[in-house]
Amino acid sequence: MSNSMINPSIVNLLEKVDDRYSLVTITSKRSRQLIDGAKPLVDIDSTKPVTVAINEIHEGKITYKTVKEGIK
């Protein structure tokens, strides 16, 4: 049994994104889309938007662009 309460683990999720900040940002934006009525891209038992978003990220269903420029 895993010590992690989150499945997939943070370590596995960080393999899919650049860093923790990106993971939080992508998860929150996708969760908001799901709350607003977007269809889930994965088939899981949970209906919780954050859980669905995390699983979508883990399965590689979510893409994102990194903006290199800061606010000027």
Curated annotation (Swiss-Prot):
Example GO molecular function: DNA-directed RNA polymerase activity
One GO cellular component term: cytosolic DNA-directed RNA polymerase complex
Coiled coil segments of this chain: none
Keywords, alphabetical: DNA-directed RNA polymerase, Nucleotidyltransferase, Transcription, Transferase
Catalyzed reactions: RNA(n) + a ribonucleoside 5'-triphosphate = RNA(n+1) + diphosphate
Enzyme class: transferase
EC number: 2.7.7.6
Domain of life according to the entry: Bacteria
GO biological process, one term: DNA-templated transcription initiation
Oligomer status and interactors: The RNAP catalytic core consists of 2 alpha, 1 beta, 1 beta' and 1 omega subunit. When a sigma factor is associated with the core the holoenzyme is formed, which can initiate transcription.
Family assignment from sequence similarity: Belongs to the RNA polymerase subunit omega family.
Function: Promotes RNA polymerase assembly. Latches the N- and C-terminal regions of the beta' subunit thereby facilitating its interaction with the beta and alpha subunits.
NCBIfam families for this protein: rpoZ (TIGR00690)
Record's protein name: DNA-directed RNA polymerase subunit omega
Source species: Clostridium botulinum (strain Hall / ATCC 3502 / NCTC 13319 / Type A)
Gene: rpoZ
